[in-house]
Amino acid sequence: MNLLIETNVEVNFRSIEEFTRVMASELLEDKINFEILKEDNFIKIKVKSEKLNQSTEFSYVDLGNKIEDQVLTMCKISLLELLDKKYDWGSLMGVRPTKVLRRLLINGCDYKEARKILKDFYLVTDEKINLMETVVKKELELLDKEHINLYIGIPFCPTKCKYCSFASYEINGGVGRFYNDFVEALLKEIQIVGDFLKTYSKKVSSIYFGGGTPSTLMEEDLERVLRKLLENIDMSDVKEFTFEAGREDSLNVKKLEIMKKYSVDRISLNPQSFNLETLKRVNRRFNRENFDLIFKEAKKLEFIINMDLIIGLPEETTEDILNTLSQLKDYDIDNLTIHCLAFKRASKLFKESQERNSIDRALIEKHIQKIVEEKAMKPYYMYRQKNIIEWGENIGYSKEGKESIFNIEMIEENQNTMALGGGGISKIVIEERNGIDYIERYVNPKDPALYIRELDKRCKEKIEMFKKEKIWKS
């Protein structure tokens, strides 16, 4: 990339370069000049492309503290104006769109004014603004800064899916030899963190086992970990306890019964696609008969059940996707999460190929909408990613009262997170001003060997971060 940027005021060049790479790649070998002018109560951006020998202007009223870094945002928007590019999400890229709307509301906008800014300034379409508003209204009913959430990462899977970029290692691969020591280290970390939380000012409101595939844990280890958790964590304020039991090839009825015994009330059962050829291509084993058995038993045990599907898997056609969607009628699920595949650099899929079939966006969205209406579900959380396919958002739908609090808190980065296990990211969220949060993070090693070796040191450093929260707030 040989993009050259010139401006008459200081801006974040790296941010503009990344925006150009994803949203305006025609300009990557160009020389771009931005002239930023402030006139009365307006900000004006004049942008010129040397390669295209074109220029344009974008001006907007100075919004003050209602948005973060208006000049930088306007520089990015002016590039879309220069190329006459139209996206459903306008200039919003790789961000949590609902946080943009929530900030506008925090800083004094009503929904009418916020919609105008999203449409006229950020260039978002009415359809996506409607989605944002629906999600934010539900989130505002459930967001809670007065508690924390607990995340436990199990970095093992039966096989590594090619699209996956998460902390995960094949249980039967070389790293699998650290499994037993990992479990022992996790039990120790639960004890250490539990002791600290007894002195911490905020109680836990949600618990989430992720990974990896947490249900890769052997039955006896699953019981040991869950028992240790309940022995050391105050459950009095816990509203939900989720276990990401995503793969049927890691599950049996006994494991479901153990989860239920130790207060897990939500699980995910994630086919991702019902097309067996697709699942083979991405190295994901799937037995439909066992999946249906597990689903049936989970319903008997009265778990709240989420199901994940991915749109845009390699070589999947519109017909393949519609076939998967049509089969949802056979499952009485409480949540449905639709992911649009984003090629992550850490995934094998990114390294092997970036080719995907063209699919009929409008037809697929129409079918999704029909399904969620039939199941009495509404969107309750969403997020976007870079490198995502054309229309680009991941949406969680839920029946009323079955929303995942953890998902909302994590996407909105509203609540402190204490993370244990492999790859877990702990967060301290400090609300500074005008809806802008300062977030301090601490990352557990995703590599099991490193996690085991550095457990004591890492626990000490992580707890020290939480102890500093009072200093940052003062």
Set out the residue ranges of the language-model regions.
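Short, conserved phosphate-binding/catalytic loop or strand-edge motifs used
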Residues: 94-99, 133-136, 167
